[in-house]
Amino acid sequence: KTSISLDLKSANDKQTALSLIEKADVLIEQFRPGVMERLGLSYEITKALNPGIIYCSISGYGQSGPARDLAAHDLNYMARSGLLSLSGDEHGQPGLPCALIADIAAGAYPAMMNILLALQQRAKTGHGAWLDIAMGDNLLPMLYWALGEGELTGRFPTMGEGLVCGGSARYQIYRTSDDRYLSVAPLEERFWKVFCDAIDLPMSDRDDASHPKRSQEAVAKRLASMPLAHWLALFEGKDVCVQVVNTVSEARQDPHFADRGLFEHRIATDNGSLGALPVPIASCFRDPPGLKDYPRRHHKESA
């Protein structure tokens, strides 16, 4: 892998870019709509140079529509999609997700998927494609259950309702007595029974279908009565669908992830090395774990 930095407003650097485009399979750009056109690197221009090119434009709201030119970031895309409205605190304030869901799950991953589809299509037809990847659009498929429920019943779910938005005792985050937290998700009846038996939940509090609030409060009270270590020991070896809410530091040291080799890849730097970030690529497509150099390339070498 190599890299190059170009000033696309420079005539020489722009010519370098055009020379690379002539030989490229894929071009990915993440400017606001219209910027590549102003730079003289629109799809029409690149297609004229390279008819088979896969031209992937990743933007917030897409290449068309009334919101296409709006300045926005990940949080804004999640807000517009309705995703933020479904989880929050007891006062109804939406929670602040600490993951760039739109950038990764609604931007990079759909781009990769559509690029692969376009390459397959080109192998059959010889034609390239312009891929309009809108992060705002691609968050909506993640709400398939909420959208589906609304279409079927005429009422869309809101915060604190439904199976995965806080309306069920079987899909919750509960506090322990030492202020740690457990993610509890025994959705299926067989898991729910094992879970209830394990925490010795009274039979009168187990009918969460008829009395969801009472069941939720009973589970919360029970789990808050003992520390995390007690519950982890109690759940050991049982199919209860319970997992401690790890800190990032704890996740980094998790023996399961270590066994899976997620942090074995390292990148050489001028002052030593750094752990490479995990990527969702199957190990059969990657080099064995080890120390790798970071991408380097000087302008003169590329020009």
What does each model-found stretch correspond to?
Residues 267-303:
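Flexible, small-/acidic-enriched active-site or ligand-binding loops
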